[in-house]
Amino acid sequence: MGVFRFISISLAAVSAANAAQILSMPHAQTVPNSYIVMMKDDTSDDDFNHHQSWLQSTHTHNITRRATIQNAGMRHKYNFSKMKGYSGIFDEETIKDIAKDPKVMFVEPDTIISVHGKVEQSNVPSWGLARISNPQPGAGSYIYDSSAGEGITVYSVDTGVDVNHEDFEGRAIWGSNQVNDGDDRDGSGHGTHTSGTMVGKEFGIAKKAKLVAVKVLGNDGSGPTSGIVAGINWSVEHARQNGGTKKAVMNMSLGGSSSSALNRAAAQAVEQGMFLSVAAGNDNQDAQSSSPASEPSVCTVGSSAEDDSRSSFSNWGPAIDLFAPGSNIISARPGGGSQSMSGTSMAAPHVAGLAAYLMALEGISGGAVCDRLKELGTSSITDAGPGTPTNVLINNGGAKGGKPNPNPAPSPSPSPSQPSEPQQPTPSQPGQPGEPFPGEPQQPTPSQPGQPGEPFPGEPFPGEPFPGEPFPGESAPAPAPQHPHTPYPGGDNFDFDGFWKKYFGGEHWRKMFSSFWN
Protein backbone atom coordinates (compact mmCIF):
# COMPACT_ATOMS: atom_id res chain seq x y z
CA MET A 1 0.00 0.00 0.00
CA GLY A 2 2.85 2.31 0.85
CA VAL A 3 4.54 1.56 -2.47
CA PHE A 4 1.33 2.35 -4.38
CA ARG A 5 0.96 5.64 -2.53
CA PHE A 6 4.59 6.52 -3.32
CA ILE A 7 4.08 5.82 -7.03
CA SER A 8 0.88 7.90 -7.10
CA ILE A 9 2.59 10.87 -5.48
CA SER A 10 5.55 10.56 -7.87
CA LEU A 11 3.30 10.50 -10.94
CA ALA A 12 1.43 13.54 -9.65
CA ALA A 13 4.73 15.36 -9.17
CA VAL A 14 5.87 14.50 -12.71
CA SER A 15 2.52 15.65 -14.12
CA ALA A 16 2.75 18.96 -12.30
CA ALA A 17 6.34 19.46 -13.44
CA ASN A 18 5.37 18.88 -17.08
CA ALA A 19 2.19 20.95 -16.95
CA ALA A 20 1.66 23.47 -19.72
CA GLN A 21 2.09 27.13 -18.90
CA ILE A 22 -1.06 29.07 -18.06
CA LEU A 23 -0.15 32.47 -19.45
CA SER A 24 -0.86 35.69 -17.58
CA MET A 25 -2.33 38.76 -19.31
CA PRO A 26 -2.05 41.46 -16.60
CA HIS A 27 -2.46 44.46 -18.90
CA ALA A 28 -5.20 43.11 -21.16
CA GLN A 29 -8.97 43.28 -20.94
CA THR A 30 -9.92 39.64 -20.47
CA VAL A 31 -13.18 37.76 -21.02
CA PRO A 32 -14.21 36.27 -17.64
CA ASN A 33 -13.51 32.51 -17.38
CA SER A 34 -12.79 32.28 -21.13
CA TYR A 35 -9.56 30.59 -22.27
CA ILE A 36 -7.72 29.55 -25.43
CA VAL A 37 -5.92 26.20 -25.34
CA MET A 38 -3.17 25.40 -27.86
CA MET A 39 -1.95 21.84 -28.45
CA LYS A 40 1.64 20.93 -29.31
CA ASP A 41 2.64 20.62 -32.96
CA ASP A 42 3.05 16.84 -32.78
CA THR A 43 -0.52 16.28 -31.58
CA SER A 44 -2.21 13.80 -33.91
CA ASP A 45 -5.88 13.89 -34.85
CA ASP A 46 -6.47 10.86 -32.61
CA ASP A 47 -4.70 12.57 -29.70
CA PHE A 48 -6.80 15.69 -30.24
CA ASN A 49 -10.05 13.73 -30.37
CA HIS A 50 -9.09 11.82 -27.22
CA HIS A 51 -8.29 15.09 -25.44
CA GLN A 52 -11.68 16.55 -26.38
CA SER A 53 -13.50 13.46 -25.09
CA TRP A 54 -11.53 13.64 -21.86
CA LEU A 55 -12.27 17.37 -21.58
CA GLN A 56 -16.00 16.83 -21.94
CA SER A 57 -15.99 14.28 -19.12
CA THR A 58 -13.73 16.33 -16.85
CA HIS A 59 -15.59 19.57 -17.44
CA THR A 60 -18.98 17.97 -16.81
CA HIS A 61 -17.70 16.44 -13.57
CA ASN A 62 -16.21 19.71 -12.32
CA ILE A 63 -19.25 21.81 -13.19
CA THR A 64 -21.63 19.29 -11.63
CA ARG A 65 -19.58 19.29 -8.45
CA ARG A 66 -19.14 23.06 -8.16
CA ALA A 67 -21.83 24.61 -10.40
CA THR A 68 -19.92 27.90 -10.50
CA ILE A 69 -20.18 28.97 -14.16
CA GLN A 70 -23.15 29.33 -16.44
CA ASN A 71 -23.05 28.44 -20.17
CA ALA A 72 -19.63 26.85 -19.81
CA GLY A 73 -17.89 24.48 -22.21
CA MET A 74 -16.01 24.45 -25.52
CA ARG A 75 -16.94 27.19 -28.00
CA HIS A 76 -14.44 27.18 -30.89
CA LYS A 77 -12.28 24.36 -32.24
CA TYR A 78 -9.15 25.17 -34.27
CA ASN A 79 -7.57 22.67 -36.64
CA PHE A 80 -5.54 23.88 -39.63
CA SER A 81 -1.94 23.47 -40.74
CA LYS A 82 0.03 22.40 -37.65
CA MET A 83 -2.25 24.24 -35.27
CA LYS A 84 -4.78 22.41 -33.13
CA GLY A 85 -6.60 23.94 -30.21
CA TYR A 86 -9.87 25.26 -28.89
CA SER A 87 -11.47 27.94 -26.75
CA GLY A 88 -14.18 27.83 -24.16
CA ILE A 89 -15.48 28.90 -20.79
CA PHE A 90 -14.06 26.80 -17.96
CA ASP A 91 -13.64 27.07 -14.21
CA GLU A 92 -10.21 27.32 -12.61
CA GLU A 93 -9.96 23.64 -11.66
CA THR A 94 -10.77 22.51 -15.19
CA ILE A 95 -8.08 24.81 -16.58
CA LYS A 96 -5.53 23.31 -14.19
CA ASP A 97 -6.56 19.83 -15.33
CA ILE A 98 -6.23 20.85 -18.99
CA ALA A 99 -2.72 22.21 -18.42
CA LYS A 100 -1.60 18.82 -17.05
CA ASP A 101 -2.15 17.09 -20.40
CA PRO A 102 1.34 16.57 -21.94
CA LYS A 103 -0.09 17.36 -25.39
CA VAL A 104 -1.07 20.91 -24.35
CA MET A 105 1.41 23.64 -25.35
CA PHE A 106 -0.09 26.54 -23.37
CA VAL A 107 -3.33 27.99 -22.02
CA GLU A 108 -4.07 31.68 -22.54
CA PRO A 109 -6.84 33.89 -21.12
CA ASP A 110 -9.19 35.14 -23.83
CA THR A 111 -8.76 38.89 -24.35
CA ILE A 112 -10.66 41.66 -26.13
CA ILE A 113 -9.42 42.81 -29.55
CA SER A 114 -10.56 46.07 -31.15
CA VAL A 115 -10.46 47.79 -34.52
CA HIS A 116 -7.60 50.16 -35.27
CA GLY A 117 -9.67 52.91 -36.88
CA LYS A 118 -11.64 55.93 -35.82
CA VAL A 119 -14.28 58.00 -37.56
CA GLU A 120 -13.35 61.60 -38.24
CA GLN A 121 -15.28 64.44 -39.82
CA SER A 122 -13.46 65.52 -42.92
CA ASN A 123 -14.19 66.93 -46.33
CA VAL A 124 -10.80 66.24 -47.84
CA PRO A 125 -10.71 64.27 -51.10
CA SER A 126 -9.48 60.68 -51.04
CA TRP A 127 -5.78 60.79 -51.79
CA GLY A 128 -4.46 57.30 -50.98
CA LEU A 129 -5.04 55.71 -54.39
CA ALA A 130 -3.13 58.44 -56.22
CA ARG A 131 -0.29 58.36 -53.72
CA ILE A 132 0.47 54.65 -54.12
CA SER A 133 0.81 54.88 -57.92
CA ASN A 134 2.92 58.04 -58.17
CA PRO A 135 6.48 58.74 -56.97
CA GLN A 136 5.61 62.03 -55.28
CA PRO A 137 2.69 63.26 -53.14
CA GLY A 138 0.08 65.56 -54.61
CA ALA A 139 -0.86 63.59 -57.73
CA GLY A 140 -4.51 63.38 -58.72
CA SER A 141 -4.76 60.10 -60.60
CA TYR A 142 -4.49 56.40 -59.82
CA ILE A 143 -2.46 54.51 -62.45
CA TYR A 144 -2.83 50.74 -62.48
CA ASP A 145 -2.70 47.66 -64.66
CA SER A 146 -6.05 46.44 -65.97
CA SER A 147 -5.56 43.00 -64.36
CA ALA A 148 -6.53 44.78 -61.12
CA GLY A 149 -6.32 41.76 -58.81
CA GLU A 150 -8.45 39.46 -60.95
CA GLY A 151 -8.37 35.85 -59.72
CA ILE A 152 -7.40 36.78 -56.15
CA THR A 153 -9.71 36.49 -53.13
CA VAL A 154 -9.43 38.92 -50.21
CA TYR A 155 -10.70 37.94 -46.75
CA SER A 156 -11.90 40.87 -44.66
CA VAL A 157 -11.49 39.69 -41.04
CA ASP A 158 -13.28 42.60 -39.43
CA THR A 159 -16.73 43.84 -38.32
CA GLY A 160 -18.48 42.37 -41.36
CA VAL A 161 -19.13 43.97 -44.75
CA ASP A 162 -22.14 45.45 -46.53
CA VAL A 163 -21.67 43.02 -49.42
CA ASN A 164 -24.51 44.71 -51.33
CA HIS A 165 -22.73 48.08 -51.52
CA GLU A 166 -22.60 49.27 -55.13
CA ASP A 167 -18.83 49.70 -55.01
CA PHE A 168 -18.34 45.90 -54.78
CA GLU A 169 -20.28 45.20 -58.01
CA GLY A 170 -21.41 41.78 -56.79
CA ARG A 171 -17.84 40.58 -56.14
CA ALA A 172 -18.33 40.43 -52.35
CA ILE A 173 -20.01 37.63 -50.41
CA TRP A 174 -20.79 36.98 -46.77
CA GLY A 175 -18.55 34.26 -45.38
CA SER A 176 -18.73 33.66 -41.64
CA ASN A 177 -19.92 35.23 -38.40
CA GLN A 178 -17.71 34.22 -35.47
CA VAL A 179 -19.31 36.80 -33.18
CA ASN A 180 -22.43 34.62 -33.05
CA ASP A 181 -24.64 37.67 -32.59
CA GLY A 182 -27.13 36.63 -35.27
CA ASP A 183 -26.43 39.90 -37.09
CA ASP A 184 -24.87 39.13 -40.47
CA ARG A 185 -24.12 42.70 -41.43
CA ASP A 186 -21.61 45.45 -40.70
CA GLY A 187 -23.23 47.47 -37.94
CA SER A 188 -20.20 49.69 -37.35
CA GLY A 189 -19.04 50.54 -40.87
CA HIS A 190 -15.41 49.67 -40.21
CA GLY A 191 -15.28 46.46 -42.26
CA THR A 192 -17.15 47.99 -45.20
CA HIS A 193 -14.72 50.93 -45.26
CA THR A 194 -11.58 48.76 -45.20
CA SER A 195 -13.05 46.44 -47.83
CA GLY A 196 -13.84 49.34 -50.14
CA THR A 197 -10.18 50.37 -50.04
CA MET A 198 -9.11 46.84 -50.95
CA VAL A 199 -11.47 45.88 -53.78
CA GLY A 200 -14.00 48.66 -54.45
CA LYS A 201 -14.65 49.79 -58.02
CA GLU A 202 -14.24 53.46 -57.10
CA PHE A 203 -12.38 53.43 -53.78
CA GLY A 204 -10.35 50.24 -54.20
CA ILE A 205 -6.92 49.17 -55.37
CA ALA A 206 -7.62 45.63 -56.60
CA LYS A 207 -10.77 46.51 -58.50
CA LYS A 208 -11.40 43.03 -59.91
CA ALA A 209 -10.57 40.91 -56.85
CA LYS A 210 -13.26 39.02 -54.95
CA LEU A 211 -14.01 39.64 -51.29
CA VAL A 212 -15.26 37.40 -48.48
CA ALA A 213 -16.63 38.97 -45.28
CA VAL A 214 -15.52 37.24 -42.06
CA LYS A 215 -17.11 38.91 -39.04
CA VAL A 216 -15.02 38.55 -35.88
CA LEU A 217 -15.81 41.88 -34.18
CA GLY A 218 -19.19 43.12 -33.00
CA ASN A 219 -20.97 46.32 -33.92
CA ASP A 220 -19.00 48.13 -31.20
CA GLY A 221 -15.75 47.25 -32.97
CA SER A 222 -14.49 44.71 -30.44
CA GLY A 223 -14.51 40.98 -29.87
CA PRO A 224 -12.68 38.13 -28.10
CA THR A 225 -9.39 36.75 -29.35
CA SER A 226 -10.94 33.28 -29.50
CA GLY A 227 -13.38 34.39 -32.19
CA ILE A 228 -10.64 36.04 -34.23
CA VAL A 229 -8.56 32.86 -34.17
CA ALA A 230 -11.69 31.01 -35.32
CA GLY A 231 -12.09 33.53 -38.15
CA ILE A 232 -8.52 32.91 -39.30
CA ASN A 233 -9.13 29.15 -39.16
CA TRP A 234 -12.33 29.51 -41.22
CA SER A 235 -10.65 31.76 -43.81
CA VAL A 236 -7.72 29.41 -44.37
CA GLU A 237 -10.03 26.43 -44.85
CA HIS A 238 -12.33 28.38 -47.18
CA ALA A 239 -9.40 29.60 -49.27
CA ARG A 240 -7.86 26.14 -49.41
CA GLN A 241 -11.06 24.69 -50.84
CA ASN A 242 -11.92 27.63 -53.13
CA GLY A 243 -8.99 28.52 -55.36
CA GLY A 244 -6.09 27.90 -52.99
CA THR A 245 -4.37 29.81 -50.19
CA LYS A 246 -1.69 31.09 -52.58
CA LYS A 247 -4.35 33.16 -54.32
CA ALA A 248 -5.70 34.57 -51.06
CA VAL A 249 -5.10 37.72 -49.02
CA MET A 250 -6.27 38.35 -45.46
CA ASN A 251 -6.62 41.82 -43.97
CA MET A 252 -6.72 42.29 -40.20
CA SER A 253 -7.33 45.92 -39.27
CA LEU A 254 -7.53 45.05 -35.58
CA GLY A 255 -5.34 44.35 -32.59
CA GLY A 256 -4.96 44.15 -28.85
CA SER A 257 -2.56 43.04 -26.16
CA SER A 258 0.14 40.56 -27.08
CA SER A 259 -1.39 37.11 -27.60
CA SER A 260 0.61 33.96 -28.30
CA ALA A 261 -2.54 32.24 -29.57
CA LEU A 262 -3.41 34.98 -32.06
CA ASN A 263 0.17 35.31 -33.31
CA ARG A 264 0.39 31.53 -33.72
CA ALA A 265 -2.82 31.44 -35.76
CA ALA A 266 -1.62 34.28 -38.00
CA ALA A 267 1.73 32.54 -38.53
CA GLN A 268 0.01 29.30 -39.52
CA ALA A 269 -2.09 31.15 -42.10
CA VAL A 270 1.09 32.58 -43.64
CA GLU A 271 2.69 29.13 -43.59
CA GLN A 272 -0.28 27.87 -45.60
CA GLY A 273 0.54 30.43 -48.32
CA MET A 274 -1.80 33.32 -47.49
CA PHE A 275 -0.64 36.92 -47.38
CA LEU A 276 -1.63 38.74 -44.17
CA SER A 277 -1.74 42.52 -43.86
CA VAL A 278 -2.06 43.70 -40.25
CA ALA A 279 -2.64 47.17 -38.80
CA ALA A 280 0.14 48.35 -36.48
CA GLY A 281 -2.18 50.15 -34.04
CA ASN A 282 -3.11 53.72 -33.17
CA ASP A 283 -1.46 54.31 -29.79
CA ASN A 284 1.72 56.09 -30.94
CA GLN A 285 3.76 53.40 -29.24
CA ASP A 286 5.87 50.35 -30.03
CA ALA A 287 3.77 47.91 -32.09
CA GLN A 288 5.82 45.04 -30.68
CA SER A 289 3.53 44.99 -27.63
CA SER A 290 0.35 44.16 -29.59
CA SER A 291 -1.05 41.22 -31.56
CA PRO A 292 -1.19 40.21 -34.32
CA ALA A 293 1.08 43.14 -35.32
CA SER A 294 4.03 41.63 -33.43
CA GLU A 295 3.95 38.34 -35.39
CA PRO A 296 7.11 38.43 -37.58
CA SER A 297 5.65 36.54 -40.54
CA VAL A 298 2.78 38.97 -41.23
CA CYS A 299 3.14 42.31 -43.02
CA THR A 300 2.65 44.96 -40.32
CA VAL A 301 1.55 48.36 -41.58
CA GLY A 302 1.99 51.84 -40.13
CA SER A 303 -0.03 54.86 -41.25
CA SER A 304 1.14 57.85 -43.29
CA ALA A 305 -0.37 61.30 -43.85
CA GLU A 306 -0.70 63.23 -47.12
CA ASP A 307 2.71 64.90 -46.69
CA ASP A 308 4.43 61.48 -46.31
CA SER A 309 4.94 61.91 -42.59
CA ARG A 310 4.03 59.16 -40.16
CA SER A 311 0.49 59.77 -38.92
CA SER A 312 0.62 61.16 -35.39
CA PHE A 313 -1.40 58.23 -34.01
CA SER A 314 0.47 55.43 -35.80
CA ASN A 315 2.44 52.86 -33.84
CA TRP A 316 6.10 52.38 -34.69
CA GLY A 317 9.05 50.16 -33.86
CA PRO A 318 10.81 47.00 -35.07
CA ALA A 319 7.55 45.25 -36.03
CA ILE A 320 6.75 47.76 -38.81
CA ASP A 321 7.29 46.45 -42.35
CA LEU A 322 5.71 49.21 -44.44
CA PHE A 323 3.75 52.43 -44.33
CA ALA A 324 0.60 53.19 -46.30
CA PRO A 325 -1.95 56.02 -46.47
CA GLY A 326 -4.12 56.02 -43.34
CA SER A 327 -5.12 59.60 -42.52
CA ASN A 328 -8.46 60.91 -43.79
CA ILE A 329 -9.22 58.04 -46.16
CA ILE A 330 -12.58 58.06 -47.95
CA SER A 331 -14.16 54.71 -48.71
CA ALA A 332 -17.48 52.86 -48.71
CA ARG A 333 -20.01 53.07 -45.89
CA PRO A 334 -22.82 50.59 -45.14
CA GLY A 335 -26.04 51.34 -46.95
CA GLY A 336 -24.31 53.16 -49.82
CA GLY A 337 -22.17 56.23 -50.27
CA SER A 338 -18.92 56.97 -48.49
CA GLN A 339 -17.32 58.32 -45.34
CA SER A 340 -13.87 59.31 -44.12
CA MET A 341 -11.91 57.39 -41.49
CA SER A 342 -8.37 57.56 -40.15
CA GLY A 343 -6.19 54.93 -38.55
CA THR A 344 -3.74 52.15 -39.26
CA SER A 345 -6.96 50.24 -39.98
CA MET A 346 -7.15 52.33 -43.15
CA ALA A 347 -3.45 51.81 -43.97
CA ALA A 348 -3.48 48.00 -43.78
CA PRO A 349 -6.14 47.56 -46.52
CA HIS A 350 -4.02 49.65 -48.89
CA VAL A 351 -1.31 47.01 -48.44
CA ALA A 352 -3.80 44.14 -48.72
CA GLY A 353 -5.26 45.60 -51.90
CA LEU A 354 -1.85 46.21 -53.44
CA ALA A 355 -0.82 42.68 -52.46
CA ALA A 356 -3.82 41.26 -54.32
CA TYR A 357 -2.96 43.47 -57.30
CA LEU A 358 0.65 42.24 -57.44
CA MET A 359 -0.31 38.60 -56.86
CA ALA A 360 -2.50 38.75 -59.97
CA LEU A 361 0.03 40.75 -61.99
CA GLU A 362 3.22 38.86 -61.11
CA GLY A 363 2.06 35.48 -59.81
CA ILE A 364 3.79 35.84 -56.43
CA SER A 365 2.29 34.69 -53.13
CA GLY A 366 2.73 34.40 -49.36
CA GLY A 367 5.69 35.98 -47.61
CA ALA A 368 7.32 36.97 -50.91
CA VAL A 369 4.62 39.59 -51.39
CA CYS A 370 5.72 41.70 -48.43
CA ASP A 371 9.30 41.65 -49.73
CA ARG A 372 8.09 42.70 -53.18
CA LEU A 373 6.11 45.57 -51.68
CA LYS A 374 9.23 46.76 -49.89
CA GLU A 375 11.17 46.61 -53.17
CA LEU A 376 8.59 48.64 -55.08
CA GLY A 377 8.03 51.20 -52.31
CA THR A 378 9.56 54.64 -51.98
CA SER A 379 11.79 55.66 -49.06
CA SER A 380 9.85 58.79 -48.29
CA ILE A 381 8.33 58.55 -44.78
CA THR A 382 9.57 61.21 -42.39
CA ASP A 383 9.72 60.58 -38.63
CA ALA A 384 9.08 56.85 -38.93
CA GLY A 385 9.39 56.55 -35.15
CA PRO A 386 11.93 55.17 -32.65
CA GLY A 387 13.42 51.84 -33.66
CA THR A 388 11.42 51.61 -36.88
CA PRO A 389 13.63 49.81 -39.42
CA THR A 390 11.94 51.23 -42.51
CA ASN A 391 10.64 54.47 -44.00
CA VAL A 392 9.14 52.76 -47.06
CA LEU A 393 5.77 53.91 -48.36
CA ILE A 394 4.00 51.41 -50.62
CA ASN A 395 3.85 52.06 -54.36
CA ASN A 396 2.66 49.96 -57.29
CA GLY A 397 5.61 51.05 -59.41
CA GLY A 398 3.40 52.72 -61.98
CA ALA A 399 0.96 50.14 -63.29
CA LYS A 400 3.35 47.44 -64.55
CA GLY A 401 5.55 47.47 -61.50
CA GLY A 402 8.24 49.87 -62.70
CA LYS A 403 10.97 47.55 -61.44
CA PRO A 404 11.31 44.03 -62.83
CA ASN A 405 10.40 41.13 -60.59
CA PRO A 406 13.71 39.26 -60.08
CA ASN A 407 11.88 35.96 -59.62
CA PRO A 408 8.84 36.00 -61.87
CA ALA A 409 6.40 33.16 -61.32
CA PRO A 410 4.96 31.29 -64.29
CA SER A 411 1.44 32.21 -65.26
CA PRO A 412 -0.96 29.78 -63.61
CA SER A 413 -2.56 27.34 -66.03
CA PRO A 414 -5.87 25.57 -65.53
CA SER A 415 -5.68 22.11 -64.04
CA PRO A 416 -6.42 19.44 -66.68
CA SER A 417 -8.82 17.83 -64.26
CA GLN A 418 -11.02 20.91 -64.11
CA PRO A 419 -14.06 20.85 -66.43
CA SER A 420 -14.41 23.69 -68.92
CA GLU A 421 -17.95 24.26 -67.69
CA PRO A 422 -19.01 24.07 -64.04
CA GLN A 423 -20.97 21.02 -63.02
CA GLN A 424 -24.50 21.33 -61.79
CA PRO A 425 -24.44 21.96 -58.05
CA THR A 426 -25.67 19.25 -55.75
CA PRO A 427 -27.65 20.07 -52.62
CA SER A 428 -25.42 20.69 -49.63
CA GLN A 429 -25.62 22.32 -46.26
CA PRO A 430 -24.99 26.08 -46.49
CA GLY A 431 -22.02 27.47 -44.72
CA GLN A 432 -19.37 24.81 -45.36
CA PRO A 433 -15.96 26.23 -46.31
CA GLY A 434 -15.59 23.91 -49.30
CA GLU A 435 -19.03 24.47 -50.76
CA PRO A 436 -18.70 25.26 -54.48
CA PHE A 437 -20.18 28.33 -56.04
CA PRO A 438 -23.25 27.37 -58.08
CA GLY A 439 -23.34 27.19 -61.85
CA GLU A 440 -26.91 28.44 -61.95
CA PRO A 441 -28.69 31.10 -59.89
CA GLN A 442 -30.55 29.94 -56.85
CA GLN A 443 -32.25 31.54 -53.90
CA PRO A 444 -30.05 31.78 -50.79
CA THR A 445 -31.00 29.70 -47.79
CA PRO A 446 -30.51 30.84 -44.20
CA SER A 447 -27.28 29.85 -42.47
CA GLN A 448 -26.47 29.59 -38.81
CA PRO A 449 -24.43 32.41 -37.24
CA GLY A 450 -20.75 31.57 -37.09
CA GLN A 451 -20.82 29.18 -40.06
CA PRO A 452 -19.20 29.87 -43.43
CA GLY A 453 -21.46 31.92 -45.64
CA GLU A 454 -23.51 30.93 -48.61
CA PRO A 455 -22.38 30.79 -52.23
CA PHE A 456 -23.20 33.60 -54.61
CA PRO A 457 -26.97 33.49 -55.12
CA GLY A 458 -28.67 34.09 -58.43
CA GLU A 459 -30.68 36.88 -56.89
CA PRO A 460 -29.22 39.69 -54.78
CA PHE A 461 -29.38 39.38 -51.02
CA PRO A 462 -32.22 41.50 -49.64
CA GLY A 463 -30.69 44.75 -48.52
CA GLU A 464 -31.67 47.04 -45.71
CA PRO A 465 -30.28 50.32 -44.44
CA PHE A 466 -27.21 50.03 -42.25
CA PRO A 467 -26.87 52.38 -39.31
CA GLY A 468 -23.21 53.29 -39.86
CA GLU A 469 -23.10 54.22 -36.23
CA PRO A 470 -19.96 55.87 -34.77
CA PHE A 471 -17.48 54.05 -32.61
CA PRO A 472 -17.90 54.42 -28.84
CA GLY A 473 -16.78 57.84 -27.68
CA GLU A 474 -16.88 59.38 -31.14
CA SER A 475 -19.40 61.74 -32.63
CA ALA A 476 -21.26 60.66 -35.73
CA PRO A 477 -19.31 61.54 -38.87
CA ALA A 478 -20.57 64.13 -41.25
CA PRO A 479 -21.29 62.54 -44.62
CA ALA A 480 -18.29 62.81 -46.89
CA PRO A 481 -18.72 64.33 -50.34
CA GLN A 482 -20.70 61.88 -52.40
CA HIS A 483 -18.96 60.43 -55.40
CA PRO A 484 -20.95 59.65 -58.51
CA HIS A 485 -21.64 55.93 -58.62
CA THR A 486 -22.47 54.33 -61.96
CA PRO A 487 -22.14 50.66 -61.12
CA TYR A 488 -24.60 49.56 -63.81
CA PRO A 489 -25.65 50.92 -67.21
CA GLY A 490 -28.35 53.52 -66.99
CA GLY A 491 -27.39 55.10 -63.67
CA ASP A 492 -30.24 55.53 -61.19
CA ASN A 493 -33.01 54.86 -63.72
CA PHE A 494 -31.97 51.54 -65.23
CA ASP A 495 -34.20 48.44 -65.24
CA PHE A 496 -32.56 46.27 -62.55
CA ASP A 497 -34.76 43.20 -63.15
CA GLY A 498 -34.14 43.29 -66.89
CA PHE A 499 -30.43 43.86 -66.36
CA TRP A 500 -30.17 40.97 -63.88
CA LYS A 501 -32.06 38.59 -66.19
CA LYS A 502 -29.99 39.58 -69.19
CA TYR A 503 -26.57 39.34 -67.59
CA PHE A 504 -27.01 36.85 -64.75
CA GLY A 505 -29.40 34.24 -66.11
CA GLY A 506 -28.88 30.94 -67.88
CA GLU A 507 -25.68 30.13 -69.73
CA HIS A 508 -24.08 33.54 -69.18
CA TRP A 509 -24.28 32.96 -65.40
CA ARG A 510 -22.67 29.51 -65.81
CA LYS A 511 -19.79 30.84 -67.90
CA MET A 512 -19.19 33.76 -65.59
CA PHE A 513 -18.84 31.61 -62.50
CA SER A 514 -16.78 29.02 -64.37
CA SER A 515 -14.02 31.62 -64.62
CA PHE A 516 -14.86 33.39 -61.36
CA TRP A 517 -13.54 30.72 -59.02
CA ASN A 518 -10.96 29.03 -61.27
From Swiss-Prot:
Residues 20-116 form a propeptide. Belongs to the peptidase S8 family. The gene is SUB1. Residues 1-19 form the signal peptide. It is an enzyme of class 3 (hydrolase). It is found in: Secreted. One of its GO terms (molecular function) is serine-type endopeptidase activity. Glycans are attached at N233, N251. Residues 282-294, 378-394 have a biased composition (Polar residues). The active site is at D158 (charge relay system), H190 (charge relay system), S345 (charge relay system). Keywords: Glycoprotein, Hydrolase, Protease, Secreted, Serine protease, Signal, Virulence, Zymogen. Residues 34-115 form the Inhibitor I9 domain. Residues 175-198, 282-312, 378-496 are annotated as: Disordered. This is Subtilisin-like protease 1.
